[in-house]
UniProtKB/Swiss-Prot annotation:
This is PBAN-type neuropeptides. Residues 34-63, 86-117, 131-153, 178-195 form a propeptide. One of its GO terms (biological process) is neuropeptide signaling pathway. It comes from Apis mellifera. The keyword Glycoprotein does not apply. Residues 1-33 form the signal peptide. Keywords: Amidation, Cleavage on pair of basic residues, Hormone, Neuropeptide, Pyrrolidone carboxylic acid, Secreted, Signal. GO terms for molecular function: myostimulatory hormone activity; neuropeptide hormone activity. GO terms for cellular component: extracellular space. A hormone that controls sex pheromone production in females and pheromone responsiveness in male. Also mediates visceral muscle contractile activity (myotropic activity). The modification Leucine amide is found at residues 80, 128, 163, 175. Belongs to the pyrokinin family. The gene is PBAN.
Length: 195
């Protein structure tokens, strides 16, 4: 019984260890296989010299690298933003391709319909719902004094009068006390020198 418990825990430990080891080996072979699969002619397509295939030059100082240095950097994965070569042509859905072909070769016929004048051209004059009897070319000048007097009588004052006053111009008391004589208001203090 004790032997079975020891054997089962040993068996679990070895199984887990073997699985982890296989995963690490697989990941390392996948990461290094990406760089081993490159063709060597890509280095000659650059403007680099063939003797400096694995070197990097900055400010005229070239550092020689070996192939082991390149694969040792793969522990951290490929560079971010690195793009892979896309040799394959992107696949296009057949429905999208048929739709694009329909737009490239239009089978549409453009038909123009002659315009017939159904509406009459009218001059729009806004009147706010009622007819005004004003002459359009009078420019608001009265022809004589009678017309001026009748226009003043017709129109109501623009502002409501204060406290029932009907005088055309009522001065404010702040304009000066000497204006009381204009409206014929009696003085309240006859002895006051300010009046």
């Amino acid at each position: 019984m004790i032997g079975f418990a020891v054997f089962s825990s040993f068996n679990r430990f070895t199984t887990i260890f073997v699985c982890v080891l296989l995963c690490v080996v697989y990941l390392l072979s996948y990461a290094s296989g990406e760089y081993d699969g490159r063709d060597s002619s890509s280095g000659s397509n650059n403007d680099r010299a063939p003797s400096n295939e694995f070197g990097s030059c900055t400010d005229g100082k070239c550092i020689k690298r070996t192939s082991q240095d390149i694969t040792s950097g793969m522990w951290f994965g490929p560079r971010l933003g690195r793009r892979r070569r896309a040799d394959r042509k992107p696949e296009i859905n057949s429905d999208i391709e048929a739709f694009a072909n329909a737009f490239e070769e239009p089978h549409w016929a453009i038909v123009t319909i002659p315009e017939t004048e159904k509406r009459q051209i009218t001059q729009f004059t806004p009147r706010l719902g009622r007819e005004s009897g004003e002459d359009y070319f009078s420019y608001g000048f009265p022809k004589d004094q009678e017309e001026l007097y009748t226009e003043e009588q017709i129109y109501l004052p623009l502002f409501a009068s204060r406290l029932g006053r009907r005088v055309p111009w009522t001065p404010s008391p702040r304009l000066g006390r000497q204006l009381h004589n204009i409206v014929d208001k009696p003085r309240q203090n006859f002895n006051d020198p300010r009046f």
